[in-house]
Amino acid sequence: MVCALGIEGSANKIGIGIIRDGKVLANVRRTYITPPGEGFLPKETAKHHREAILGLVESSLKEAQLKSSDLDVICYTKGPGMAPPLLVGAIVARTLSLLWNIPLLGVNHCIGHIEMGRLITGAQNPTVLYVSGGNTQVIAYSNKRYRIFGETIDIAVGNCLDRFARIIKLSNDPSPGYNIEQLAKSSNRYIKLPYVVKGMDVSFSGILSYIEDLAEPGKRQNKRKKPQEEEVNNYSQADLCYSLQETIFAMLVEITERAMAHCGSNEVLIVGGVGCNERLQEMMRIMCEERGGKLFATDERYCIDNGLMIAHAGAEMFRSGTRMPFEESYVTQRFRTDEVLVSWRDD
């Protein structure tokens, strides 16, 4: 039996999770929330994490009813992510490892999402759509690696949603994407936006620029038809949110279906913070059912960044014999999903 404590702090959430042989014992989390119209800067985010992390470690052990001596391994997010917040998690993980004399493992953030999704949903060998504020990838397992079949060629889908939420001054509480989703539910008026799919890759930066012009006509100089001439003042924020979701989610469904066909898969697993979006799940479910497949998705406890996913992935690594020398316990802002040898899967 492997009992693991995981620390996740790659972006604006700091989370601690404890798991033992696939059983969830604790999953606590705090979110750094900024005022409407503002994003989160690495330095301020790291400060938030520093102030919260030790209390969360204590809370997780109390919730799990465990002592430090009950743990077999300390796991932390090695990357990808923002360096200052990542360092907070890594430094605390190193300290606990030395203090408690427990092995230490660095975990890939994306691998954590995938393995947590597989554990919670029971998906066996799905095509994975990983959608978050920092990543957009279509992934499938093959020969001891999670292979990336398609991805964004510029910004992530969550970044596109977050930046548009800032443009129209939506609240960041509980998250910009959630508030876009709720606002979109009050409209069914579709405004045609750019649709950019290249094989199994997607692009969101042009869509964001285009819809920014619609939301703030005349703010930027551009060569295309002036927004005022398109009577953009007739568009409500709800119309824009609805249209943005419908467009970018259709793109994600298309590339996921293409990857399913390529891999011969009949399962789709959505992971990452954007995976909580009910409209994305609905569109993906329709596609899966039309193909005779099945959709797997989790709720906000597991799809949003959390320490539990790092604990679970780290426990799987530890169980399969993976060990990490202490001097390799660094962090990296760039850590590709397919760099990791998936030693714990035999299929």
UniProtKB/Swiss-Prot annotation:
Disulfide bonds: none annotated. Its cofactor is a divalent metal cation. It is an enzyme of class 2 (transferase). GO terms for molecular function: metal ion binding; N(6)-L-threonylcarbamoyladenine synthase activity. One of its GO terms (biological process) is tRNA threonylcarbamoyladenosine modification. Pfam families: TsaD. Substrate binds at Y130, V131, S132, G133, G134, D162, G177, E181, N277. GO terms for cellular component: cytoplasm; EKC/KEOPS complex; nucleus. Belongs to the KAE1 / TsaD family. This is Probable tRNA N6-adenosine threonylcarbamoyltransferase.
